[in-house]
Amino acid sequence: MAMKFIAPMAFVAMQLIIMAAAEDQSAQIMLDSDIEQYLRSNRSLRKVEHSRHDAINIFNVEKYGAVGDGKHDCTEAFSTAWQAACKKPSAMLLVPGNKKFVVNNLFFNGPCQPHFTFKVDGIIAAYQNPASWKNNRIWLQFAKLTGFTLMGKGVIDGQGKQWWAGQCKWVNGREICNDRDRPTAIKFDFSTGLIIQGLKLMNSPEFHLVFGNCEGVKIIGISITAPRDSPNTDGIDIFASKNFHLQKNTIGTGDDCVAIGTGSSNIVIEDLICGPGHGISIGSLGRENSRAEVSYVHVNGAKFIDTQNGLRIKTWQGGSGMASHIIYENVEMINSENPILINQFYCTSASACQNQRSAVQIQDVTYKNIRGTSATAAAIQLKCSDSMPCKDIKLSDISLKLTSGKIASCLNDNANGYFSGHVIPACKNLSPSAKRKESKSHKHPKTVMVKNMGAYDKGNRTRILLGSRPPNCTNKCHGCSPCKAKLVIVHRIMPQEYYPQRWMCSRHGKIYHP
């Protein structure tokens, strides 16, 4: 178990040093640059500003032939402008305000020169008629970018209305949607150090904003909207990615506000407004007997308004793997169906899915300070597998009642764990709060460190980086296969644990993979 550390403000300015084992006090372990950059990520929130000296690196799409009248095809002009801007350091590709530019499918490919900004102040719109699209996979695709910013006060409109028509039908009381033929609006692949800020995304034919194989991403102050009945129009989808920070976003669509898929870890969501939609979903995981892994997800501050679900974890029968180290706290529900839902029997087939023995393990999930009203009788539903019960489920300070004011209920099937404080509705088979058994490997950390690796103070938000290593992990900088060390990012109140992929030893300048 990681050593707890509460730092007074005076210590925030201290430099954090990860000390090596007692046998070698001179060796130091440093985070590799990408993780360090993530920990310092708030410093990247400043607005992109350009001096007069930088003005030569502004690339206005109009100068490359784009016509912002909402009629002309500007696809080639956007592509040409991108290629020119991509080659220049500190470039800004500008879509000017008060104009509407129609484009077809575009592939914005990297790598590009550092500090590249795509600033959208006007409207970028897709073709309304699906027959006019070049393909039905992705509208605006970004790939292989590092240190890239997509920002502005403009709109990116997927014009999805004609795509949605006839895509869904009801079979045996269940809505079945054909989602194979509609494109995603925006997708990022194989990119690091991204900032998405300030934009309004709307009416995507299918998913609005998707990230695959990305790392170190901040999404700040964007809005995503689509009609309540628009099929599969997820707001933000994340898969096979890590180190994400979503802050102060507003999402209301016909599906998940945020969906976190397999291979994702270290996802922080703060101050989200969600609704309409299907809430925040982890999953679905384990489809077609696949293995799935999701870990270290922290939702701190969210409001769900008239959503079909609130905080949902969904897995298919027959899968394997694990969803773990998940924290939901400081959440408000307003007339939301299924405010708290774990469903290990997720199924979209028109007929009932076959019962299977294996399942994705769900463990170490915390719900803290969840309040509001439920539109369904069972405000808490823990529907866990009998062959793979949910472990270490923790409920603390829960107050959920029906929208009508009546008492709600809790459904608990095969979920084991604890409760503390007032939990309404009460859940059977959960024990009163008890001390968790300490892991032997982390019972007595060898060292604790604190250095200038992400420790800083900004307003009311303080972050301290802590580290600990198991007692049998010595001389880390001298081994070829060092054991894992645990880092804890103290994020407001609730710590978020994080296992780095690489360590760099400053003594030798080598990178080791734990």
Curated annotation (Swiss-Prot):
Localization terms from the record: Secreted; Plastid, Amyloplast; Secreted, Cell wall
Active site: 255, 278
Record's keyword annotation contains Ribonucleoprotein: no
Primary location recorded for the protein, binned into one broad class: secreted
Spans traversing the lipid bilayer: none
PROSITE patterns associated with the record: POLYGALACTURONASE
GO terms classed as biological process: carbohydrate metabolic process; cell wall organization; fruit ripening
Name of the protein in its database record: Polygalacturonase
Gene source species: Cryptomeria japonica (Japanese cedar)
Organism lineage string: Eukaryota, Viridiplantae, Streptophyta, Embryophyta, Tracheophyta
